[in-house]
């Protein structure tokens, strides 16, 4: 059986995603679709609007055959780490192709990756701008293109990861079909995930934009997960923890701990807290991830101890058959059910993330849950 791989968040699963996976299957002639999906928190460190099980079910009922969770240690990361983590899993699962949306699928991303060797490295030691801004200035000077759209950024990261990882699959970008990620207005049947989330918050009807499974799950929401709800946990942690201990948190370095601590003492809501910490050096995306690391109490040692694995969230009959085909050749552990030992060992970070997500009133995310089976 031939498999095509997708890297997804499905936040939530919508009609654009259904188009993407149908195109992926058509372009590659694959027998099965394998999706590596973020769990309950996105790449930016935000809680997903629906939990990973609801999103897995919608994916399986709309064309995906196997859903594997991207561990939180790789899921809540900048594009380069996110891409490497996801593609490592797909490569181990022996997919033949990885298909992804991009704003400019005609760009030669592989050539853009090679162009990095011509960058002026001295320019990156200036701290009056974020690394991303300085990187784009260099990239545009060398290639004529700047990475300003999120899917183009990921496309570049996928090509960089493939070059570094020597992966065996083929990368295939396709045209993104929904409205721009920053657009907050619905644009008919094909609308962005961001616009759909905003519409749900505003109590608008989104049934035209999502499959019936997603619409049903959204209709049952009693609260929309957001950082304002988690902020008391974050603020308390920052206020109660001495700065030297905060510095042991992953990605909290170079005085950022003092800035975070001071902001937590002064601000009572997450939005004003984030604005107080923001500088030209730190993007909002990075600060959102740092907020997640702090609330999860994710340390440098936690990250050093992390090793990849395949946590299966669900499969169809075809997905089950494919998993049986490849499982004996996997380099990473295959996990279908979480036990008491795992929650304190290899799955400790994902277990903690699931417990954090339960603050939104959701059921247990890990210990009592096995893969969803549509067989």
From Swiss-Prot:
Name of one Pfam family that matches: HIGH_NTase1
Known catalytic reactions: cytidine(34) in elongator tRNA(Met) + acetate + ATP = N(4)-acetylcytidine(34) in elongator tRNA(Met) + AMP + diphosphate
Entry EC no(s): 6.3.4.-
Cytoplasm found in the keyword field: yes
Keyword Ligase on entry: yes
MF annotations from Gene Ontology: ATP binding; ligase activity, forming carbon-nitrogen bonds; tRNA binding
Binding-site residues, ATP: 7-20, 101, 151, 176
GO cellular component: cytoplasm
Protein's name in the database: tRNA(Met) cytidine acetate ligase
